[in-house]
Amino acid sequence: MASLEDGTYRLRAVTTHNPDPGVGGEYATVEGARQPVKAEPNTPPFFERQYWQVTRNADGQYTIKYQGLNTPFEYGFSYDELEPNAPVIAGDPKEYILQLVPSTTDVYIIRAPIQRVGVDVEVGVQENTLVYKIFPVDGSGGDKAAWRFTRE
């Protein structure tokens, strides 16, 4: 599996069945510290809050940190709880597993590195908010949320 290079990216919400839906779309957008991360269009006033520093750690997992201007402290993809539909919070950056979607070069499933019997906890979108979704590990859950990582 190809690993993502460290760098600054925009993260566009796509799906595993439609990893390249064309023009437009919604991107991971920070609203503020301890606030849910939103999915917004890549237009003013949102686009300046859509830069994310993705860094691979020694254990092969990644942190996704907000890379905006004038941030008084470091925050990134985080969580208070990993329950179905709980929001992704802009907080103390947690580690994630990035799983490349087959037949793509820049589309990944973002998974929380936790052990739950028979399921994966993955980052998706619900009503313009990034949330944690539960999918069976056997692939029977259908179309999964995925993210196109566009290098900036």
From Swiss-Prot:
Keywords: Protease inhibitor, Thiol protease inhibitor. The keyword Kinase does not apply. Signal peptide: none annotated. The keyword Transmembrane helix does not apply. InterPro entries: Prot_inh_I48_clitocypin. One of its GO terms (molecular function) is cysteine-type endopeptidase inhibitor activity. Homodimer. Belongs to the protease inhibitor I48 family. Binds and inhibits cysteine proteinases. Inhibits most strongly papain and cathepsin L, more weakly bromelain and cathepsin B while it is completely ineffective against cathepsin H. This is Clitocypin-6. It comes from Clitocybe nebularis (Clouded agaric).
